[in-house]
Amino acid sequence: MNIRETGLLGEIRAAAYLRRRGMRILARRYRTAHGEIDLIAREGTTLVFVEVKTRPRGRLDSGLAAVNAEKRGHIRYAAREYLRTHGQAAFRFDVIEISAAGLRHMKNAF
């Protein structure tokens, strides 16, 4: 399995996890000229912009650490575009890390 396929499977798993917790998935792989958001969900009245990091077996680095300042900037840019075109709402940024050890959901990650 290549990196793209691994990432896609991670996003599918993360979306299923969020749905089981009562969230509604509004968009997947939302792209703009300067950024992409893996998942956009709604939890009550809050929009949740989710970055999914899938770590293949044997990788020990943290998915959260991979969401560096540059990556956060791209996600924020894409979120601004989404809010501009879909209307303002309360929002937060989450990171979901998927690894051989399981799934870890970090709310308000940045």
Task: State each model region's role.
Residues 30, 53, 109-110:
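Residues forming the ATP-binding cleft of Hanks-type serine/threonine protein kinase domains
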